[in-house]
Design a protein with these regions (language model features):
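Membrane-interface helix-loop junction between the first two transmembrane segments
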Residues: 21-40
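Hydrophobic transmembrane alpha-helices
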Residues: 8-18, 135-246
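Alpha-helical transmembrane segments of integral membrane proteins, especially early/N-terminal helices
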Residues: 5-13, 39-55, 132
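Membrane-water interface of transmembrane alpha-helices
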Residues: 19-25, 91-111, 175-190
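Helix-boundary and loop/linker segments of multi-pass membrane transporters
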Residues: 1-3, 34-35, 73-74, 117-121, ...
């Protein structure tokens, strides 16, 4: 571990991004899977990723305590926009985790039976629910969460820490799409033709339709509950209040 807290944080961020972009996000992953199998690869990569996240979190805490450097002073009204963005992020993260999707790890079975029809009603058609809006709801949630924290905090440590998550969430959809295209071929092409990475892109271009009934109300409410729990428990969990100072 490097002695300088900021350099240590930067190294942790580089490690976190590196293993996702240059291992998981490239053909190197394909070769490793062929060598050791999908299950062992996923297990080893999960451990490596967890280790990188733990290092990143510890480095962030240390840098925040020892070398706190303001880059800009957030305006008071930024807080309201950031909290709204995080509310949307919480809902997207929940929906991304509960929706069966071919973009999720091990989610290729979601395309079984897909026949390429774009009306979203055929058996096995995965382009439904939140996936009509974006095929990467979880990563869009992470991106909103990360950017909101960067803007709201305004310090160097937050820029590096949350910026690492923002970079991965921005690049991640392209890496995942490329992996799925290589592995699933025509089945992926049919799904991608009915969906979009950019929210509402497929709907605005007439390739899909917005059907909020497929999303329902339960899981968005769970997202709101997650948001409220984190907002009111932020100080207890992380030592910093997320609520506006009166």
């Amino acid at each position: 571990m490097t002695a300088d807290p900021t350099l240590n944080l930067a190294a942790a961020a580089a490690c976190f991004l590196g293993i996702h972009i240059f291992i998981s996000g490239t053909r190197l992953r394909d070769g490793l899977v062929r060598m050791i199998g999908e299950g062992p690869y996923m297990g080893l990569f999960s451990l490596l990723s967890l280790g990188a996240i733990v290092w990143l979190a510890m480095a962030f805490n240390r840098a925040s305590e020892e070398t706190f450097t303001f880059l800009w002073a957030p305006a008071p009204w930024w807080h309201h926009f950031a909290m709204t963005a995080i509310l949307v992020a919480a809902i997207l993260v929940v929906l991304g985790n509960v929706t069966k999707s071919p973009t999720a790890a091990g989610g290729e079975s979601a395309l079984e039976g897909s026949d390429g029809n774009d009306d979203g009603r055929e058996a096995g058609d995965a382009a439904r629910g939140i996936l009509r809006i974006t095929r990467h709801p979880f990563l869009w949630g992470v991106l909103l969460w990360a950017l909101a924290h960067v803007a709201m905090n305004g310090d160097l440590s937050s820029l590096i820490f949350f910026g690492a998550f923002a970079v991965l969430a921005f690049i991640g959809p392209m890496l995942i799409d490329a992996k799925r295209a290589r592995k699933l071929g025509d089945r992926w092409d049919a799904f991608a033709a009915r969906t979009s990475n950019l929210p509402f892109g497929a709907i605005l271009t007439g390739r899909n339709k917005l059907r909020l009934g497929e999303i329902g109300i339960l899981w968005p409410l769970v997202g709101v509950g997650l948001y409220l729990a984190l907002a009111f428990g932020h100080e207890w969990l992380f030592g910093v209040s997320a609520l506006p100072v009166r």
